[in-house]
């Protein structure tokens, strides 16, 4: 396993001794870690909902024959794969020799621009292959030993309460979620549950006017009772919503998108386009979460042997083109210097294809980390297909990187958490 930096630092990273070497010293800063300005930094989480098929996303070229043996009908033909060794010749002939699905040309370009890290076999110790349980485990930051280890708070919410305590409550939302009508458990703090605004189904420009039209006179006093406490919570939440709505509306109207960013007409592109406009408009929101659904590809993942068009083909195209346009947008000026994106999927897929040109629920999957602060490279090695047998239902179970390691690296080294 090659020791390749994930983020370039000129001094020792805060996560040293906590994380594997591939996740230590991970961001490319020009100044020493102690002098970094963290104030404007933001992360953008892209949820690939449904369980992305990592083996058809990041193709393991060093064990390609084993891959084809497990997937005779749905494998990506080698002639179509985008080999990363064409960019980094050090990968060729090693157990890190990988290629990208042909519809990930945007991600391939980011790798070429030194802005994409690929992390292999991301997961957690006690894998749960329920969509609902696994995404809750990811959002709460736990190991999967039970549904959520007794936690009812999320890692984002706890991070915000601990690291940005002086900003709570504030005049802008600490988090903005788009793409899912259910607000993510990840944004729930131990004490605060109103840290994020969910814009799903909303027009950001008119968000404030919609909310403000619902407001009236708040009561000045509350009964000293359970009812009074609940009423005060509702009033406080409504007041915060109006404040947040004003901040979102102002930022959206003040912001703009780079005219040269070629956003496609897709749902994910619209979500990321909104994020870029809000950031350029000056809002100080720290964490954005967007969503691309449809990755539960039990059938018609491909059309058939040799024809990789199908559900997964279209999803990866939507992901890649949206991310490439977003990066073109934010990198057109200095705001891109302070943005890191990360893909998250609740689990991967089985090594073996099923009988419906698809794949069933698996465990580990690769993650993409991208942005100007990121150093291109590969962390981890290609999977060992010999562990996928009938006795374990053809699962790849070996976790190379606990998802919490990736999150901890970003929070500590990029956002400056302690």
What is each stretch, according to the model?
Residues 323, 330-355:
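Metal-dependent active-site segment of extracytoplasmic phospho-/sulfohydrolases and closely related
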Residues 285-287, 336-338, 344, 362-365:
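Active-site lining segments that contact anionic ligands and/or coordinate catalytic metals
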Residues 354-358, 362:
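Histidine/acidic-residue-rich catalytic or RNA/ligand-binding cores of hydrolases
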Residues 2-321, 325-332, 352, 366-418:
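Feature for exported/extracytoplasmic and membrane-associated proteins, marking the mature portion
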């Amino acid at each position: 396993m090659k020791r390749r930096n994930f983020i370039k630092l000129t001094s020792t990273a805060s996560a040293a001794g906590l994380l594997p070497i591939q996740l230590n010293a991970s961001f490319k800063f020009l100044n020493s870690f102690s002098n970094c300005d963290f104030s404007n930094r933001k992360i953008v989480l892209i949820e690939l909902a449904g369980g992305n098929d990592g083996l058809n996303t990041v193709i393991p070229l060093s064990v390609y024959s084993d891959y084809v043996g497990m997937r005779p009908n749905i494998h990506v033909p080698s002639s179509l794969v985008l080999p990363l060794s064409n960019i980094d010749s050090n990968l060729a002939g090693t157990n890190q020799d990988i290629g990208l699905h042909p519809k990930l040309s945007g991600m391939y370009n980011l790798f070429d621009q030194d802005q994409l890290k690929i992390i292999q076999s991301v997961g957690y110790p006690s894998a749960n292959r329920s969509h609902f349980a696994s995404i809750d485990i990811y959002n709460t930051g736990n190991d999967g030993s039970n549904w959520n280890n007794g936690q009812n708070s999320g890692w984002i919410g706890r991070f915000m309460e601990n690291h940005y305590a002086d900003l709570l409550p504030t005049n802008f939302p600490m988090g903005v979620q788009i793409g899912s009508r259910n607000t993510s458990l990840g944004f729930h703090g131990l004490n605060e549950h109103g840290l994020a605004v969910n814009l799903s189904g909303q027009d950001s420009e008119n968000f404030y006017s919609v909310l403000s039209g619902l407001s009236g006179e708040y009561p000045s006093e509350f009964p000293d009772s359970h009812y009074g406490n609940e009423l005060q919570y509702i009033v406080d939440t409504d007041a915060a919503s109006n404040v947040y709505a004003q901040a979102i509306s102002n930022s959206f109207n003040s912001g703009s998108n780079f005219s040269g960013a070629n956003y496609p007409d897709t749902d994910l592109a619209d979500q990321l386009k909104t994020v870029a406009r809000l950031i350029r408009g000056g809002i100080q929101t720290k964490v954005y979460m967007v969503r691309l659904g449809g990755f539960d590809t039990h059938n018609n993942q491909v059309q058939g042997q040799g024809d990789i068009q199908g559900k997964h083909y279209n999803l990866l195209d939507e992901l890649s083109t949206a991310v490439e346009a977003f990066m073109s947008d934010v990198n057109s000026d200095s705001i891109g210097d302070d943005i890191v994106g990360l893909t998250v999927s609740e689990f991967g897929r089985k090594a073996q294809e099923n009988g419906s040109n698809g794949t069933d629920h698996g465990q580990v999957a690769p993650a993409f980390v991208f942005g100007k602060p990121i150093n291109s490279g590969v962390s981890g090695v290609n999977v060992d297909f010999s562990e996928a047998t009938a006795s374990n239902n053809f699962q790849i179970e070996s976790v190379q990187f606990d998802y919490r390691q990736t999150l901890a690296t970003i929070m500590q080294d990029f956002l400056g958490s302690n």
